[in-house]
Amino acid sequence: MADITFMALHGSIGENGKLQATFDNLGIKYTGPNSLGCTLSMNKLVTKQIFKTNGVPTPRGTSLTSKTKDTPLDELGYYLPLVVKPCSNGSSIGVYICHTEEEYYDAIHKSFDVDNTDEVVIEPFI
């Protein structure tokens, strides 16, 4: 058995904490964050809250669900340009920068297609 496993994975299996948890259970040492860190950071809203609590600057953001996805931007207090992204995904999959309302609503629907939490995050584009 190896002394340590060098983690060089990309995508959900390497980012969501499941492989790290398996290694933890098997007593296999590895590089990178532990399973809890990976799991927490996969959820962008949880990550934003951790940043805020610890004084790390982060743009304001809100989430939309499939029930609230058609709420007009002015009712949400957000204005273009915006970033739309799945709440729980990695590798920049489903992340869009939107300059028009058409791009925004298209991005919302596309981001829901790749999210597994029924939440999409919107933030000002900075």
Task: Tell where the protein language model's regions lie, with residue ranges.
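A conserved helix-loop-beta module that forms one wall/lid of the active-site cleft
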Residues: 20, 24-94
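Short catalytic-loop micro-motif centered on adjacent basic/acidic residues
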Residues: 5-8, 31-33, 60, 97, ...
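Phosphate-binding site of ATP-dependent enzymes
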Residues: 99-126
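Short, amphipathic alpha-helical segments
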Residues: 13, 41-45, 98, 102
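N-terminal glycine-rich "phosphate-gripper" loop used for MgATP/nucleotide binding
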Residues: 1-24
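Gly/Ser/Thr-rich beta-alpha loop segments that engage phosphate groups in nucleotides
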Residues: 13-16, 92, 96
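Short beta->alpha connector loops
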Residues: 11-13, 64-69, 126
